[in-house]
């Protein structure tokens, strides 16, 4: 039996700012829907928390410490049935500098 392979573009987005990430996802989904492709997402992935522990004083006081954290928010957007218009529109899309984008065809 021959199975029909469906074309799919998977876009992974990462950012420290959740609102910036959500607006970028909205732009991608709107662009895909405008060009006739089907967009599924944004699908939220687990947020990674990275905690850094530093000594407050430069000398002996080991009991006094300060904690800092960074949170990396992640989303996935799947685009099914992309046309050449969809790919061109996604390449021309202007997204903020704080969002890391990874595209798989």
Curated annotation (Swiss-Prot):
Q: Which PROSITE patterns match?
A: RIBOSOMAL_S10
Q: Name one GO molecular function term.
A: structural constituent of ribosome
Tell me, what is an example of a GO biological process annotation in this record? translation
Instruction: Write out the GO cellular component annotations.
Output: ribonucleoprotein complex; ribosome
Report the InterPro entries cross-referenced here: Ribosomal_uS10, Ribosomal_uS10_CS, Ribosomal_uS10_dom, Ribosomal_uS10_dom_sf
Pfam families in alphabetical order: Ribosomal_S10 (PF00338)
Specify whether Flavoprotein is a keyword of the entry: no
> Keywords of this protein's UniProt record, alphabetized?
Ribonucleoprotein, Ribosomal protein
Q: How does it assemble?
A: Part of the 30S ribosomal subunit.
Task performed by this protein: Involved in the binding of tRNA to the ribosomes.
- The family this protein is said to belong to: Belongs to the universal ribosomal protein uS10 family.
- What is the protein named? Small ribosomal subunit protein uS10
From which source organism is this entry? Trichodesmium erythraeum (strain IMS101)
């Amino acid at each position: 039996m021959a199975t029909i392979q469906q074309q799919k573009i998977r876009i992974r987005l990462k950012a420290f700012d959740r609102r910036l990430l959500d607006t970028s996802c909205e732009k991608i989904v709107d662009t895909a829907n405008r060009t006739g492709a089907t967009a599924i997402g944004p699908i939220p992935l687990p947020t990674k928390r990275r905690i850094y522990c530093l000594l407050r004083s430069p000398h002996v006081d080991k009991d006094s410490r300060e904690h800092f954290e960074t949170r990396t928010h992640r989303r996935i957007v799947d685009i099914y049935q992309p046309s050449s218009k969809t790919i061109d529109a996604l390449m021309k899309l202007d997204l903020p500098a704080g969002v890391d984008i990874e595209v798989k065809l």
